[in-house]
């Protein structure tokens, strides 16, 4: 996933950082109409995008046909998030990947200001 770190859910990631978080959504994908998509982009609400290991956003790196490779979005206020990846599945060292822990720590970090 490529991260947009401009949210209370992703503020501890680097800008455009590429992370590995598993998905488990069968045939689900993200779709909205053009008006909502424009609003999401204009308001910087897309916080996760499916990408290659190098951070390239391509059709090949999109596992489910999600519109614009979208994997996670926030509402306009930035206090609600919806995402397909499961950061809780990579938030402890026992999983051999802790890319997800910063998702949760970002929320704490935001509220400790």
Describe each region flagged by the PLM:
Residues 1-113:
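Amide-donor transfer/coupling interface in amidating biosynthetic enzymes
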């Amino acid at each position: 996933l490529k991260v947009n770190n401009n949210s209370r859910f992703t503020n501890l990631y680097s800008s455009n950082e590429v992370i590995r978080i598993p998905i488990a959504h069968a045939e689900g994908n993200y779709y909205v109409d053009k008006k909502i998509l424009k609003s999401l982009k204009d308001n910087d609400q897309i916080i996760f995008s499916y990408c290659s290991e190098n951070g390239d956003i391509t059709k090949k790196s999109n596992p489910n046909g999600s519109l614009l490779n979208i994997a996670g979005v926030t509402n306009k206020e930035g206090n609600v998030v919806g995402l397909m990846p499961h950061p809780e599945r990579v938030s402890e060292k026992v999983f051999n990947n802790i890319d997800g822990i910063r998702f949760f720590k970002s929320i704490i970090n935001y509220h400790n200001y």
